[in-house]
A protein has these predicted regions:
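Substrate-binding cleft of secreted/luminal carbohydrate-active enzymes
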Residues: 443, 705-721, 728, 734-798
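A glycine-rich, often tryptophan-bearing local segment used as a flexible ligand/cofactor-contacting loop or short
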Residues: 230-303, 310-316, 321-323
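Helical hinge/lid and interdomain linker segments adjacent to catalytic or ligand-binding clefts
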Residues: 179, 183-264
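Active-site-adjacent "subsite" loops/lids of carbohydrate-active enzymes
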Residues: 460-465, 523, 527, 538-597
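Glycoside hydrolase catalytic-domain groove-lining segments
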Residues: 628-750
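Extracellular ligand-binding interfaces
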Residues: 54-133, 138, 147-157, 162-165, ...
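Extracellular ligand-binding/catalytic regions of CAZymes and related secreted enzymes
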Residues: 166-171, 193-197, 225, 328-422, ...
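Catalytic domains of carbohydrate-active enzymes, especially glycoside hydrolases
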Residues: 197, 201, 477-502, 598-599, ...
Length: 798
């Protein structure tokens, strides 16, 4: 018999080591008067363990703000943590953090994660500048600025702002080692990705550029990462070689320098491009247990700079595998006494596994990094769903045990979680940080499994999955995908089978894609596999984008003036939705699919909008706008740009033009096959004039132009997700027509199974008949869907 909850949880209250953080504001209750209200914000007051900032958001205000003078040097900080709590997080649309520096500000904002005590993390790369700040080393003020969400009063209690300063690890952003602006942009994005994963893992690090190398940027470092620095200059190579000579360790991703590879004991192979998109799909270690990494790390790479052992002291530790799990000849990772080398950059798929990979590789370079990584893993072990601690998680899961299909088995998981707490504390006390990390990861996985098990299923729920590649898990094997999805409760599949300039099925309207040539008719194949298993098929159209289009098709579109043109007169590789021929192309493509494949359940529109405010200012757009408004523009596009006298009128017109196109698609679809439903992926937020993207989907619902919508509510904040869904279902004619999109592996969000479960529950509470998961991936296959099947999507008795 398990011991009592109170006694068992006592171990969970033992203090755990935390990653080093420099507190820059403690919010001592007695210091409330030091915060000056900005404009008409109420005065803050002392709280039990912090300062409470009243939020008068039932009034007609956009935000509240408070300032405090400081004198801080934050130049060494890589990120900032803020501990705060709000019982009504829906009152806050975004929490803004501002650092004043001379004549300007560093500004950033994020949504509240949820109710109760939360920790917001701001990377330095999250901050933009306003005015002309003097530098991070001269911070003379802090401003807190919650922006109004829902119209209700609340209080926000702040407890701490801490700076996460760099340590023995340096991350080097590629600048002059990149040959052009495009490559430098890739380097910046890749470096930011690596830094964020390190921050989440608790690994302290500094950020420099490769231009800083010659100025001694690595003088105090034990290890350095080069996330994408393809061609270091001779002076940079000299600095890197000097760093290696004094015992420093390097981790290189997708390097193109044979000299640097040789200096590290490796041999660089030639640039290699995959002849098939399923060639390199995952990384598999020879000994994942020894390296403390998952058995398989998902990554869809399309090109490599293969690297091989160069001497007897270097070796391969991981290889690439294809979509079927077959090992490929190219090594993914090699190591030597001087560091490691990966044959591609670190992409953004499978974020949790990538984080564990980075911890292992960085600790290989500098074993002292096991300690902060273990401390973070211990802290985060119970922070799943909206739980604030391990104690909170176990208390809530214990309360919900009767909901589990097998309460006894779920209770056993909780008992193991409790027993692990004592082992973790013993390991930390003995300085066994690597072992403590392993135990904390195990503990978190058990909490995730237990949380999944106590979720309730809902019979008849629409459970959909987007497939961005349009080829299933394994190209050429739709049966495998359909079997797996059906076995895990998925009853609707949205494969991406058509783009602006190509199709994955035979078409007389759109050119053939490479996917069609390699794997055959994907629409026929998915229908044959999915329909017998009770899975609906909604054909996903990505409109306007020419990704994958043959060169001759794109050239013809440009010659015919059918591409979008920005305000500077530059052509963009997108078809213009305002061009009559492009609109007809969409109508013909939709009708063709509906006629030729009558077994489909729906047509799903994506990018049924403009990409941004930079499009479209082509001559055809001007002609149609002037004809519709019966007024010529004297200065084009100046008249319709922001600040122009006809800007508001133009924004309304472009939005109405998209709305009219949706109605035309509906009419064409009804004529071709009245049994096929029409849906669309839309932005979650609603702008009255359609915003920069010209998309006001409430009008589509009001007119009955769509059967349902799938708002892309891609956020890691349960509070923001809940607010979005409640607003969406409140729109006229929206009842039963909102199927929220959940960003499991979206660029904007990376969700573990508990995060996904929480958002599904919130969608149910708002009255939604179902949901969609973005998107089909190894993470979805191995983690998300199996977890959901334990509770939320488990079979129910008839």
């Amino acid at each position: 018999m398990a011991q009592s909850l109170a006694a068992a949880l006592a171990l969970l209250l033992l203090p755990a080591a935390a990653p080093a953080a420099r507190v820059v504001e403690s919010f001592a209750p007695a210091s409330a008067a030091a915060w000056t209200p900005y404009q008409k914000a109420p005065k803050p007051v002392a709280a039990a363990t912090g300062i409470a900032f009243p939020l008068p958001f039932s009034k007609a205000v956009d935000r509240a703000a408070w300032d405090k003078p400081v004198a801080l040097d934050l130049s060494a900080a890589t990120a900032f943590e803020i501990d705060l709590a709000c019982p009504r997080p829906e009152a806050i649309r975004q929490f803004g953090l501002y650092f004043k520096s001379g004549g300007g500000w560093y500004a950033a904002s994020k949504p509240m994660p949820g109710p109760g005590l939360q920790t917001l993390v701001f990377a330095k790369s999250d901050f933009s500048t306003e005015g002309s700040p003097a530098g991070w080393d001269r911070i003379d003020g802090i401003r807190l600025s919650p922006w109004k969400g829902e119209a209700l009063d609340a209080a926000l209690v702040l407890h701490r702002i801490a700076a996460l300063d760099g340590g023995s690890l340096v991350v080097v952003r590629g600048t002059s080692s990149c040959p052009n602006d495009s490559e430098r942009a890739v380097a910046a994005k890749t470096t930011e990705r690596v830094s964020r994963l390190l921050i989440e893992a608790g690994i302290p690090h500094s950020l420099v550029t490769d231009d800083d190398l010659v100025n001694g940027a690595l003088n105090n470092a034990a290890a350095a990462l080069l996330p994408y620095n393809p061609q270091p200059s001779a002076p940079q190579l000299k600095a890197l070689n000097a760093f290696l000579a004094r015992g420093g360790k390097l981790g290189v991703f997708y390097g193109a320098s044979p000299a640097l590879a040789s200096a590290m004991g490796f041999k660089l192979g030639p640039y290699t491009k995959a002849e098939r998109p399923d060639r390199w799909r995952s990384i598999a270690f020879d000994d994942p247990v020894a390296w403390l990494v998952p058995p398989r790390i998902w990554q869809k790479s399309h090109n490599l700079f293969p690297v091989y052992p160069g001497d007897r002291n270097s070796s391969v530790i991981a290889f690439w595998e294809n979509a079927r799990g077959v090992r490929q000849p190219e090594p993914a990772l090699v190591v030597s006494p001087r560091g490691f080398w990966m044959s591609h950059i670190l992409l953004n798929d499978d974020a949790q596994s990538k984080k564990e990979l980075l911890v292992a590789l960085c600790a290989h370079l500098d074993p002292s990094l096991w300690a902060p990584a273990a401390a973070r893993a211990v802290r985060d072990a119970g922070r799943v769903n909206d739980f604030q601690s391990l104690f909170h998680a176990l208390s809530e899961i214990e309360r919900r045990l009767p909901h589990a299909a097998d309460p006894g088995a779920t209770r056993a998981l909780l008992d193991e979680v409790r027993s692990l707490s004592a082992q973790i504390q013993a390991a930390l006390a003995a300085g066994q940080h690597r072992h403590a990390l392993l135990l904390a990861r195990r503990q978190r996985q058990l909490v995730l499994r237990a949380d999944a098990a106590v979720q309730l299923p809902r019979p008849g729920e629409f459970v959909g999955v987007w497939d961005h590649d349009g080829t299933g898990y394994i190209p050429g094997d739709w049966a495998f995908t359909a079997n797996h999805l059906a076995a895990h409760g998925v009853n609707a599949l949205f494969p991406n089978l058509a783009w602006g300039g190509c199709a994955h099925y035979p078409s007389k309207v759109l050119p053939a894609s490479d996917t069609l040539r390699l794997y055959g008719d994907q629409l026929a194949a998915v229908l044959a596999a999915a329909k017998p298993r009770g899975i609906q098929v909604h054909v996903w159209f990505v409109l306007w984008q020419l990704t994958g289009a043959p060169d001759d098709f794109a050239a013809r579109m440009k010659k015919e003036g059918r591409l979008q043109i920005d305000a500077g007169g530059n052509t963009r590789p997108w078809l213009s939705p305002h061009h009559p021929a492009n609109r007809q192309l969409v109508l013909d493509a939709v009708a063709e699919v509906a006629r030729n494949y009558p077994a489909i359940d729906g047509i799903h529109l994506d990018y049924i909008r403009l990409p941004d405010s930079q499009s479209c200012y082509a001559p055809t757009t001007r002609a149609r706008f002037e004809a519709a408004t019966q007024a010529k523009c004297r200065a084009w596009p100046a008249d319709v740009l922001a600040g122009g006298k006809r800007n508001a009128e133009f924004r309304r017109w472009r939005t109405a033009d998209i709305t009219a196109l949706v109605a035309d698609i509906r009419a064409a679809l009804r004529a071709a096959n009245p049994n096929v439903k029409l849906s669309a992926a839309v932005f979650g937020s609603i702008q009255p004039d359609g915003g920069n993207i010209a998309q006001f989907w409430p009008d589509w619902l009001r007119a009955g132009s769509v059967d349902f919508l799938t708002p892309m509510n891609y956020t890691e904040s349960s509070a923001e997700f809940s607010s979005l869904v409640r607003n969406q279902v409140a729109q006229p004619n929206a009842a039963g027509r909102i199927y929220p999109g959940i960003g499991v592996t979206a660029d904007e969000s990376r969700l573990d199974p508990a995060d996904v479960a929480r958002q599904i529950v919130l969608a149910r509470q708002a009255g939604c008949p179902g949901f969609l998961l973005f998107d089909l991936s190894g993470t979805l296959r191995d983690e998300t869907l199996p977890a959901l099947r334990q509770g939320l999507t488990r079979p129910t008795p008839p």
